[in-house]
């Protein structure tokens, strides 16, 4: 708190001086209720502290890049739009009267000046908001005021973005194993015109999900660039050392008569973020040998993002505009999960069995059509009708196979290879020699190399028979001969010699050619038409010649269609000014999951790739190109399935907002929104849910139903209900019908504000708002059955709600201000996974599974204070024109409170009440909120030259340590010293060790220490069309761990783990050391 007190004192003194200067000046709070449809190309360098009757917290899902009733080739809003797009110059010319409570707007100009490249950089110099870290799949949304991910809204151009599968059951079962890309998609920063961050309940703008706040993005438009000209061209190159990312961005904007177009194409190519001590391993071999949770270096990934934004507009006159937009982006991550917990440690560096190769993708494609009308009517000044179709796919693909030459599946110690000499194929060893057979060596003879060494264990001396192996003529020239090894001739006599044989070419049904070499037959039949055949073979290596690739390909799909109508109108009524916005939309979203598991071949060697099986079936051999030369099936497909039934969400919305200016010093914000959310579950037989997850779910099997075991073992007086029986299918159908129940949620959102301007240097704002989050489809409908962890659906869940109360005091002069803000957020009906106890899997059965269910359980409260300030030194001293100071601060506290004892603790406390009575106090105390950030301060000192040709900014971020009492370990009951029950048997368990210390309570295991990070960024504009930007980040090379990275460390699963007992592997989660960024941009 020392830094805070000092900073507050300094700011108070500065603004007291500032306020006295302002107070002595002439009053500027003149009425502004003049007609608003005047030409807008007037000078804009007027003082910004004039009272205005503009909305201060209206819904922001309105288009903000529209013309202001003027032709698009006029110089309207020149100052405002240039300020957002250009890089040079001051980046925070804020109109205090338009600044909203708990809201921050970040412009494209500011993002470019700070060299922002992703969502982390977006909030890098903000307080009270951070990104949610997930490890390999990157960031997943934001954490604001104690809640995160789906409880913080994200919108792009009026469309909600994909939500995660937020069911705690899903996270427990699947998320910790890296098989799903269960993250919220991000946006390409180069496409962003403005990003609006709202802290506090915000369902008015974002609808369901904005409990703690929202982040709303608006993308760029051609009219942002075509201010006083008809074309714009920009090419930007950038590089950053923390992940070796190369940036290429091409921007084209043009206008011809009634048409305008914008194209922004961006490519980012880099690798994983380099943690502190990234070069800890001396060489590549040591790096690859460092595997499992103890690995201290970030896993190697290649990360690319390709994004294209195209907007085409047609404006036949000043009153009508048609436009179409395409926003298409793909984020791809390829690499190796070296820290994967199930990787075989003993084979690291000398790989025999395999490793985990990943290929994750996050794809987003949005097509939008819109019509705008600017004709003034009694009902609107501007109307916009738009249709959007957005498809988002988050894919996680993992391939587990061995791709080294030392792999068991491709082992070839003798280096056998295929050579062609004089039109003859020969198999020779690594020295180019043929192997020979010495029948006098060993017990039964043996194959030897030229040096007389035994090679029997390295070659397949019993397989490769000529009648079972066929040659792929697409790969080898079947006009050649092939040298084969003959053990016995057609008379059954020993031979042990090589012979050259002709290849007989034949054709497969698909038209492809293959070759075969027939075995010679003796002249005298053994019996009937059976003759003695020679024993001849290809001498292949003993291994299969390929590695089996176990593929998990899993997609989470979110497809949204939306039609929206927005209207706005400004008018005077009696002696009050009104700025009215109203409208509504209809939105339909389909959420689905597709799991595709199959096995294929990888690391294929010559003896597997050039030959295939002549399969013996019913006494006859048939060519089988899908089978290896050993007649084993190489590719198997387990098919597609899902653990979540497809659910269509329909959302009907109406909203109304009015900013009322009662007097020159008193204004009201009155905003309302109505949401009606319907969930319509369905079932796709082509992508089924495993039958066992649904049968017996609601409607149990009867006591006389025989379900398990072979139907042939069914007792005489029982009904056959084994898998795929009519009884089993009927139970599945009945339970599916009960599961597919429709659910709906209705919510009335409001945002009420009071704006007071008692003087021309003080503004007081009050805000009271609410928000809601309808349960996600997986929280309602997900089902799972397993002897150790089962999930029961719950179609009776209530929506989560939140209420925000805020008061803000702003002292200002011109562009200088300080805002002191106090807030309280109250949350209700938190959805959490609750243990509902063991339940029989069928009626009358003694077999019971431990079932869990999502239920409304928790309530929470978060309180805090925030400070946001900026001082333009030129407002105090003329000689310091261009210098500016900034300070941001957030302090917040919160707890989750139960209405009673959490049911999941009931059995644990009962078992341990005698030896460990202290556990009950731990279980009953309010639970800390891990999504609350530690106390954070950001200082900014900068200078922009009057010529705006160069400037520099220094940011100092100070983050307090996360206190142990403010952190929570959800697995504490399985880590403390305890008595536990396993399969009905009670046993004593010793406490786990975390980082060398015994776990004794529910405090989080990994927390950040206090740290201070300094960044310095500068720009230089030597000529009008050229801008250089460069920065040094973490200037002092501080080693630090962020709280969001610390809380992402898992205690269960196979990814994002460390060795809990010792803390080995923690270094992998540390932030980068000193790193650099630079960019150059050409503009014409």
From Swiss-Prot:
PANTHER family: HEMOGLOBIN AND HEMOGLOBIN-HAPTOGLOBIN-BINDING PROTEIN 1-RELATED (PTHR30069:SF29), TONB-DEPENDENT OUTER MEMBRANE RECEPTOR (PTHR30069)
Cross-referenced PROSITE patterns: TONB_DEPENDENT_REC_2, TONB_DEPENDENT_REC_3
Motif, TonB box: chain positions: 83-90
A GO biological process held by the record: siderophore transmembrane transport
Compartments where found: Cell outer membrane
Pfam families on file: Plug (PF07715), PT (PF04886), TonB_dep_Rec_b-barrel (PF00593)
Keyword Transmembrane: yes
TBDR beta-barrel domain boundaries: 228-1084
Sequence motif TonB C-terminal box, residues: 1067-1084
UniProt protein name: Probable hemoglobin and hemoglobin-haptoglobin-binding protein 3
Region entry Disordered, spans: 26-77
Topology versus the membrane: Multi-pass membrane protein
Function comment: Acts as a receptor for hemoglobin or the hemoglobin/haptoglobin complex of the human host and is required for heme uptake.
Signal peptide: 1-24
């Amino acid at each position: 708190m020392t830094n805070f007190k000092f900073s507050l004192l300094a700011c108070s003194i500065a603004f007291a001086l500032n306020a006295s200067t302002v107070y002595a000046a002439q009053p500027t709070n003149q009425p502004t209720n003049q007609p608003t449809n005047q030409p807008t190309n007037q000078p804009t360098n007027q003082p910004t502290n004039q009272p205005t009757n503009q909305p201060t917290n209206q819904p922001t899902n309105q288009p903000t890049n529209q013309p202001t009733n003027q032709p698009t080739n006029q110089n309207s809003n020149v100052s405002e739009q240039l300020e957002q797009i250009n890089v040079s110059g001051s980046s925070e010319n804020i109109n205090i009267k338009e600044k909203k409570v708990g809201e921050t707007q970040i412009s494209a100009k500011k993002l470019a000046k700070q060299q922002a490249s992703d969502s982390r950089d977006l909030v890098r110099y903000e307080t009270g908001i951070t990104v949610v870290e997930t490890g390999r799949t990157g960031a997943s949304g934001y954490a604001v005021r104690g809640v995160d991910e789906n409880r913080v809204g994200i919108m792009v151009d009026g469309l909600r973005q994909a939500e995660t599968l937020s069911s705690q059951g899903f996270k427990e079962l699947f998320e910790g194993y890296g098989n799903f890309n269960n993250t919220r998609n991000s946006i390409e920063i180069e496409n962003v015109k403005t990003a609006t961050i709202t802290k506090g309940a915000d369902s008015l703008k974002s609808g369901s999900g904005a409990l703690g706040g929202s982040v709303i993005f608006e993308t760029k438009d051609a009219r942002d660039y075509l201010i006083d000209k008809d074309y714009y061209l920009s090419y930007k190159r950038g590089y950053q050392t923390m992940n070796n990312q190369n940036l290429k961005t091409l921007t084209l904007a043009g206008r011809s008569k009634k048409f305008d177009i914008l194209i922004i194409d961006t490519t980012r190519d880099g690798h994983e973020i380099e943690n502190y001590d990234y070069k800890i391993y001396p060489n590549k071999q040591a790096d690859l040998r460092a595997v499992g949770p103890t690995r201290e270096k970030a896993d190697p990934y290649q990360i690319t993002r390709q994004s294209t934004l195209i907007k085409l507009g047609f404006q036949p006159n000043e009153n009508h505009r048609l436009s179409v937009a395409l926003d298409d982006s793909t984020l791809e991550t390829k690499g190796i999960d070296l820290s994967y917990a199930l990787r075989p440690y003993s084979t690291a560096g000398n790989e025999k069995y395999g490793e985990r190769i990943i290929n994750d993708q996050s794809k987003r494609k949005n097509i939008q059509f819109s019509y705008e009308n600017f004709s003034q009517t009694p009902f609107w000044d501007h109307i916009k009708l738009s249709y959007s179709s957005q498809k988002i796919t988050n894919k996680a693909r993992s391939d587990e196979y061995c791709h080294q030459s030392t792999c068991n599946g491709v082992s070839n110690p003798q280096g056998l290879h295929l050579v062609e000499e004089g039109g003859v194929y020969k198999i020779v060893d690594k020295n180019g020699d043929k192997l020979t057979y010495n029948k006098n060596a060993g017990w039964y003879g043996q194959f030897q190399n030229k040096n007389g060494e035994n090679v029997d264990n390295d070659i397949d001396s019993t397989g490769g028979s000529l009648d079972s192996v066929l040659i792929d003529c697409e790969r080898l020239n079947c006009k050649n001969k092939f040298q084969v090894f003959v053990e016995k001739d057609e008379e059954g006599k020993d031979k042990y010699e090589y012979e050259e044989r002709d290849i007989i070419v034949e054709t497969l049904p698909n038209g492809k050619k293959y070759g075969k070499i027939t075995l010679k037959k003796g002249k005298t039949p053994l019996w009937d038409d059976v003759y003695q055949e020679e024993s001849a073979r290809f001498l292949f290596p003993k291994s299969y010649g390929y590695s089996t690739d176990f593929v998990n390909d899993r997609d989470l799909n979110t497809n949204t269609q939306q039609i929206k109508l927005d209207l706005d109108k400004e008018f005077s009524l009696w002696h009050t000014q009104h700025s009215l916005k109203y409208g509504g939309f209809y939105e339909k979203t389909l959420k689905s999951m597709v799991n595709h598991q199959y096995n294929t071949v990888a690391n294929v060697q010559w003896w597997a790739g050039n030959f295939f099986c002549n399969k013996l079936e019913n006494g006859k051999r048939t060519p089988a190109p899908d089978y290896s030369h050993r007649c084993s099936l190489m590719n198997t497909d387990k098919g597609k399935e899902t653990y979540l039934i497809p659910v269509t969400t329909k959302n009907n919305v109406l909203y109304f907002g009015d900013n009322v200016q009662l007097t020159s010093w008193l204004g009201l914000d009155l905003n309302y929104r109505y949401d009606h959310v319907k969930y319509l579950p369905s079932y796709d037989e082509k992508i089924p849910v495993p039958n066992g997850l649904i049968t017996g779910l609601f409607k149990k099997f009867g006591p006389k139903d025989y379900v398990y075991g072979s139907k042939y073992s069914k007792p005489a007086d029982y009904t056959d209900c084994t898998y795929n029986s009519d009884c089993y299918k009927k139970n599945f159908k009945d339970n599916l019908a009960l599961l597919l129940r429709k659910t709906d949620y209705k919510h009335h959102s409001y945002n009420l504000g009071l704006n007071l301007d008692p003087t021309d240097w003080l503004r007081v704002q009050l805000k009271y708002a609410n928000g809601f989050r309808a349960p996600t489809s997986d929280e309602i409908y997900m089902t799972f059955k397993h002897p150790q962890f089962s999930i029961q659906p719950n179609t009776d869940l209530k929506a989560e709600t939140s209420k925000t109360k805020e008061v803000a005091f702003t002292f200002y002069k011109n562009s200088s201000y300080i805002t002191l803000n106090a807030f309280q957020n109250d949350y209700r009906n938190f959805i959490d996974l609750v243990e509902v106890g063991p339940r029989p899997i069928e009626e009358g059965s003694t077999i019971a599974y431990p079932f869990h269910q999502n239920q409304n359980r928790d309530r929470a409260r978060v309180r805090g204070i925030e400070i946001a300030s900026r001082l333009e030194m030129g407002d105090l001293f003329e000689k310091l024109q261009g210098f500016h100071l900034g300070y941001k601060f957030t302090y917040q506290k919160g707890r989750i409170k139960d209405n009673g004892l959490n049911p999941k603790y009931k059995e644990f406390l009962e078992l341990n009440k005698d030896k460990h009575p202290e556990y009950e106090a731990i279980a009953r105390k309010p639970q800390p909120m891990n999504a609350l950030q530690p106390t954070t301060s950001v200082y900014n000192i900068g200078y922009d030259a009057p010529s705006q040709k160069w400037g520099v900014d220094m940011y100092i971020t100070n983050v307090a340590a996360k206190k142990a009492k403010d952190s929570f370990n959800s697995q504490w009951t399985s880590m403390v010293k305890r008595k536990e029950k396993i399969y009905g048997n009670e046993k004593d368990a010793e406490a786990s060790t975390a980082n060398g210390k015994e776990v004794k309570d529910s405090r989080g295991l990994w927390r950040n220490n206090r740290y201070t990070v300094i960044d310095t960024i500068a720009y230089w504009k030597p000529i009008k069309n050229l801008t250089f930007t460069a920065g040094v980040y973490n200037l002092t090379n501080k080693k630090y761990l962020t709280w969001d990275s610390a809380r992402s460390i898992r205690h269960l699963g196979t990814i994002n783990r460390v060795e809990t007992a010792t803390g080995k592997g923690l270094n992998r989660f540390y932030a980068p050391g000193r790193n650099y960024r630079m960019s150059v941009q050409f503009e014409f």
